Amino acid sequence: KKSIKKLIEILSTEYKYVSVLGTDCFGKEYTSLRTGTSIKNSNWNERGFVLKVYNGINYSEFSFDYISYDSVENLAEQIKEKIKTYISLFNENEVNHYPVLEEEEIAKFFKDKVDVYPTTVSDKEILNKITNINKNAIVLSDKILDVRAAYNYLHVNKIFMSNKKDLEQSYLWSEGIVQCITTNEEDTRFNYKVFSGLKGVEIIDEMESSIKEVVDTALKALEAKPIIPGMYDVICSPEVSGLIAHEAFGHGVEMDMFLKERAKAKEYIGQHIASPLVTMRDGATSERHMSSYLFDDEGVLGQDTVIIDKGVLKCGISDTLSALKLGEKPTGNGKRESFERKAYSRMTNTFFEKGYCKLEEMIKSIDYGFLLDVPMSGMEDPKSWGIQCMVNFAYEIKDGKLTGKIFSPIVLTGYVPDLLKSISMISDEICLEGSGACGKGYKEYVKVSSGGPYIKARVRLG
């Protein structure tokens, strides 16, 4: 921190805004399959710095992975020379102009706790736990081709410093998966269950308790039939609700897309775009989950943003530069894939708020329809509000009861406002999950979580 402070002081004599984000994130991934086991460094590991400078026109950024107190002056001179080069190119190219960022004076420190830190348990112990899950699942049926059990953790350590800010945070997240692949003479199917949160090795205990459930559903999936395409009343599980929240009004309200005229949501702020039952939030402080932090990658404190309030679209989520250009206050959603990448407007913990209904009531209300569970993937077009979600299973509901019949795979499609306006019942419990990664287009992967309650809606399935 002493070296960073010196670098900021030197550059601040010439530039009106200087900040540095420092990252030191480390973790491991443990996997067990029928064919063997593996331990490797987490794909999320990173260590380095990114410096942001207001160059008089807009902002220049420089990433580096080493700094010492003795080399600070030399580094500062290199940065000054690069800025001069960049500015000389501005006359030849059309560039965006930005005002200087205004900051409040803040000094804060955040350190989270988990029950069992991975570093207090040996690699061998963790791998044995994962391997036992694999072995205990495989012996349950001769129709099981393979079982994948995996545990991944990351210890996130970050600092953010400027002339007015001195921020530091340290927290740990973990994720796990139990996936079962089954086969018979006619077909091959699979099922999985994921586990995630600001937790440690204790998450493996949750994985162990899910073995029978995961295997039973994977075996049942061998009986699954294709669904007859059409419009249906459905109940979405919390995981599928989260997929809809993420795709429908997560990516669609990332405000850097407002600037690029790539998001229809910009035209509908203040308008009814969902059922009055629907309230949707995003924020690092909205829920304690995978994307909960003290500050984002631009030094903005995490917030709780209400995106949809009782059916009305209220606002989007932003990074600092998008907010600056739009004349808005940043929402603490500026996130980088790593210290080497640009900050974009990204989701954190995105979810629908709970309602007042019981799941049993919701099922009883359906004459014919389906309970959708186990999300696979999703895609939304923010420009035209089309949405497509892949879901693994649809459980048949007839005369208010689950029949035991299962259909797979399922494609959910539609126009976002139509889908959200059709929501007629919302359960009184919510659940979030944050395994995997969220991309910006086809790249820029970051950690997020999504979820919600069970929701009843009318959608097109195929």
Walk through the language-model features, giving the residues of each:
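N-terminal small-residue-enriched
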Residues: K1-G462
